[in-house]
Amino acid sequence: MLNREVVYAAPGKDESAIERFSEEIEKHNASSEQITNVSMDMSPAYIKGASNHFRNADITFDKFHVIKLLNEAIDEIRRTETAVNPCLKGSRYIWLKNPEHLTVRQSNALKTLSKENRKLSKAYQMKLTLQDIYRTTHDYHVADVGFQKWLSWAVRSRLGPIKRFAKMFKSHYDGILQYFKSHLTAGFSEGTNSRIQELKRMSKGFRNINYFISMIYLGATDLVLPSYT
């Protein structure tokens, strides 16, 4: 992660894409066994690929993806509650934002809506608490204790989407907790994906996948090409 460069690009989002990457590494006097850390979302295909082809690597599940899934659970609660309380219409982004990113008007609306809907208010506070563990904890064991307490709260929350999120969290626990050892996120790859999508828009689509991959190497990294005079 020191150089933050795209070293390999290939079509596909399944295990075979990771397998091809591991094979490509072998062609460059390296070994897949040298990969010791991998950051990813919770795609079953990626998990299987990394486990099978990077056997020495510890998997870190991206913390932003974890919070994204929790936001989806909160939004599910909001949609259900809106059917009962129409006042919640148009409030989606208020619940998805952190307090420091709300406008004064949104902040006031959040306070009012929180008083009127205890379920959403509880879910929102649970999100802030989980984020605080990520933000303020630097020790692996302290994070473990914090996560266990949070999960106990979530399981007893009586909020279906939150309880389902907690079940997912538990089933991926080791990889989520691994963040406090590796401190890896998928932030760089997400930023690179944005640049790749911009390349695609600029070109109005690529018919040749190999040409597109070449453009990724050139346009989505800070590759310095030699100049000739």
Can you name each region flagged by the protein language model?
Residues 3-5, 22, 28-60, 64-68, ...:
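Acidic/histidine-rich catalytic cores and adjacent linkers
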